[in-house]
Amino acid sequence: MSVQIRKRGRPRGRAGGLGAEDSGGIRALDRALDILDLIAVSSGLTLTEIAQRLDMAPSTVHRVLVTLAARGVAESDSQTQAWHVGPTAFRHGSAFMRRSGLVERARPLLRRLMEVTGETANLGILNGDAVLFLSQAETHETIRAFFPPGTRSALHASGIGKALLAHARPLDLKRMLREMRLERFTDMTLTDPAALVEDLVQIRARGYALDNEERTPGMRCIAAPIFDLAGEAAAGISVSGPTLRMSDARLSAMSDAVIEAARELSFGMAPRKDAGERA
């Protein structure tokens, strides 16, 4: 006669499967991750919009959002009632970037780029329809650009954002242009899709993007893409500062410095496929 000894721990469900409590927990986790994935690739969605897009009951979405907000993974704008990813989500993302080594490898190059150009150097990645800044080396100048880690900026009105858009897959670019809200920040902001596309073509041809007071009056930014082993634009590096210091006479030398830093940071300059193949 054999004697069965029950191991300590949670009771097992029938046929060794998940119990009701476990299944319910996994479903709740799935819902939370679905909601987090959705708001991470948007510029902000209301509770109603989230419920409609995910075909969830508003009450369920509300419970999940309250839980995510309590952990700092999501947060809402008190004025627009739109939900965004929170600071804890950025820390989680930063952990991945640390593992990839990009931020660590970029630090000395950001410092060197800042010293060569005299302006603040920045590192950023695509985050939904915005640029998420990961690291920076601040200039010693009193008047300077400031993008602390975790700051987000609109793609169409930032140097890194336009550099990433210019090198996006054709189908991805079409989708982003269709979904983006081309908000006007200054008189120089490109709010016409055709004008933005024309600018992106020029950016791709010359190798760097220029934010010419398109986000903040009196401030310029020069950026270049950082490519991964697959030849995809995975991140961007830039220098930002007052237009008075980043004059037209200095653009050539400064853009060369930014492009060189981007090349050094690229994980690999694998040949990019033809646009038709990539689509």
Swiss-Prot record:
Residues 102-271 form the IclR-ED domain. Transmembrane segments: none annotated. Residues 26-87 form the HTH iclR-type domain. Residues 47-66 bind DNA. Residues 1-13 have a biased composition (Basic residues). Gene3D superfamilies: 3.30.450.40, Winged helix-like DNA-binding domain superfamily/Winged helix DNA-binding domain. It holds the Pfam family IclR_C. One of its GO terms (molecular function) is DNA binding. It comes from the Bacteria. Keywords: DNA-binding, Repressor, Transcription, Transcription regulation. Residues 1-21 are annotated as: Disordered. GO terms for biological process: negative regulation of DNA-templated transcription; regulation of DNA-templated transcription. Transcriptional regulator of the bhc gene cluster involved in glycolate and glyoxylate assimilation via the beta-hydroxyaspartate cycle (BHAC). Glyoxylate negatively affects the interaction of BhcR with the promoter region of the bhc gene cluster. The beta-hydroxyaspartate cycle (BHAC) consists of BhcA, BhcB, BhcC, and BhcD enzyme activities. Overall, it converts two molecules of glyoxylate (C2) into oxaloacetate (C4) without the loss of carbon as CO2, under consumption of just one reducing equivalent and regeneration of the catalytic amino donor, which makes it one of the most efficient glyoxylate assimilation pathways. This is HTH-type transcriptional regulator BhcR. It comes from Paracoccus denitrificans (strain Pd 1222). The lineage of its organism: Bacteria, Pseudomonadati, Pseudomonadota, Alphaproteobacteria, Rhodobacterales.
